From Swiss-Prot:
<dbReference type="GO" id="GO:0039502">
    <property type="term" value="P:symbiont-mediated suppression of host type I interferon-mediated signaling pathway"/>
</dbReference>
<keyword id="KW-1121">Modulation of host cell cycle by virus</keyword>
<keyword id="KW-0899">Viral immunoevasion</keyword>
<dbReference type="GO" id="GO:0019904">
    <property type="term" value="F:protein domain specific binding"/>
</dbReference>
<dbReference type="GO" id="GO:0030430">
    <property type="term" value="C:host cell cytoplasm"/>
</dbReference>
<comment type="function">
    <text>Plays a role in viral genome replication by driving entry of quiescent cells into the cell cycle. Stimulation of progression from G1 to S phase allows the virus to efficiently use the cellular DNA replicating machinery to achieve viral genome replication. E7 protein has both transforming and trans-activating activities. Induces the disassembly of the E2F1 transcription factor from RB1, with subsequent transcriptional activation of E2F1-regulated S-phase genes. Interferes with host histone deacetylation mediated by HDAC1 and HDAC2, leading to transcription activation.</text>
</comment>
<feature type="region of interest" description="Disordered">
    <location>
        <begin position="29"/>
        <end position="48"/>
    </location>
</feature>
<feature type="short sequence motif" description="Nuclear export signal">
    <location>
        <begin position="83"/>
        <end position="91"/>
    </location>
</feature>
<dbReference type="GO" id="GO:0008270">
    <property type="term" value="F:zinc ion binding"/>
</dbReference>
<comment type="subunit">
    <text>Homodimer. Homooligomer. Interacts with host RB1; this interaction induces dissociation of RB1-E2F1 complex thereby disrupting RB1 activity. Interacts with host EP300; this interaction represses EP300 transcriptional activity. Interacts with protein E2; this interaction inhibits E7 oncogenic activity. Interacts with host TMEM173/STING; this interaction impairs the ability of TMEM173/STING to sense cytosolic DNA and promote the production of type I interferon (IFN-alpha and IFN-beta).</text>
</comment>
<keyword id="KW-1078">G1/S host cell cycle checkpoint dysregulation by virus</keyword>
<feature type="short sequence motif" description="LXCXE motif; interaction with host RB1 and TMEM173/STING">
    <location>
        <begin position="23"/>
        <end position="27"/>
    </location>
</feature>
<dbReference type="GO" id="GO:0039645">
    <property type="term" value="P:symbiont-mediated perturbation of host cell cycle G1/S transition checkpoint"/>
</dbReference>
<keyword id="KW-1090">Inhibition of host innate immune response by virus</keyword>
<dbReference type="GO" id="GO:0042025">
    <property type="term" value="C:host cell nucleus"/>
</dbReference>
<protein>
    <recommendedName>
        <fullName>Protein E7</fullName>
    </recommendedName>
</protein>
<feature type="zinc finger region">
    <location>
        <begin position="65"/>
        <end position="101"/>
    </location>
</feature>
Amino acid sequence: MHGKVPTLQDVVLELTPQTEIDLQCNEQLDSSEDEDEDEVDHLQERPQQARQAKQHTCYLIHVPCCECKFVVQLDIQSTKEDLRVVQQLLMGALTVTCPLCASSN
């Protein structure tokens, strides 16, 4: 481009297609049946761990920040018994700080 104002003659458009790109992939995926069998075998090998995993539940706990009283959400995955321990800690001396107050300290 020459000059202060571009003109149509200054703009060069080259709309030639690039060399063709092969978009085909020769990769083969494993069948999902094998994965399902592995998962079943995994559960049969460790039944105690499988039972424990089923007992864990996700809980949302809303706790006010100890500095600014902004509500902080805690996502906890635990058993009911462990949730009671967390509840006792939060009712006692344990405090929670929001990210803004934590970064300013």
